[in-house]
Amino acid sequence: SVATVSYIINNREDQKISPETRNKVLQIINLLDYTPNQAAKSLVTQKSQIVALHYKEAESYLQKAEQLHFINKLTNFLHNKNYYLMCLSEHYIEKIDLADVILTLDVAKEDFYKIGNANFSPLIALDSFIDDPVFFQINSDFQKLKKQAIQYFGETTFTFVSLPINDEKRKELIQNTFSSIKYVKSVEELDNFDYKNVLIIDSILEQLISNYYNKLYISGFSDEKFEKIFQAIEWASQRIEINNHNIVV
């Protein structure tokens, strides 16, 4: 029946369908090269499967490269989770009707609230501290990074090297965690790079000083962090009540 085909296409598990029938329908779907219409699915589920990303346009080429690396990685990750990514810079703070959830990347607190005031979709802050129990915020665990660096270098003397950071509380937390910090704005600043031990979380910096003999690279957006982002997207889009909205990875 039409209903049976619909159940199989939409992966309904609450209906009793024999394996033989399911396999036959899937074979025919494959032969016809059928893919479900996204608009039709949205009408049924009330979800667009679109995630919007708001980010502050980078000033330096290094930051632009790092943003692009993150966006590419996030796009591929969300695609594997059946989500699509929409990217917007800070110049486009407006109502976004299409998105199930809005992510922000390293934006200032005041800009975060501007985005929130313009939208009804749930907001999730990445790499910034909003400290508002209404919103999820997902950040790196700098104390954990410090412990990993001490274990790796075998001593407490090392320098945390990073691209410039917009969020003030995140910068303050880094300042209180690491005794030696170097922010890199341009490639030229790496010409006289002579630090003994270096901890890096930015992909572009890891590539630029890839031959540096005493370096520890721990991605600021690990697979674990992406999974936490996805979990927060699911919780937020489904309006599931969670006690802890402050996630550190």
Regions from the language model: what does each represent?
Residues 1-44:
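N-terminal helix-turn-helix DNA-binding module of bacterial transcription factors
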Residues 57-145:
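Alpha-helical recognition/docking segments in bacterial nutrient-uptake
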Residues 107-110, 173-249:
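Hydrophobic alpha-helical
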Residues 136-161, 222-244:
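Hydrophobic alpha-helical segments within soluble ligand-binding/sensing domains
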Residues 147-182:
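An alpha-beta-alpha
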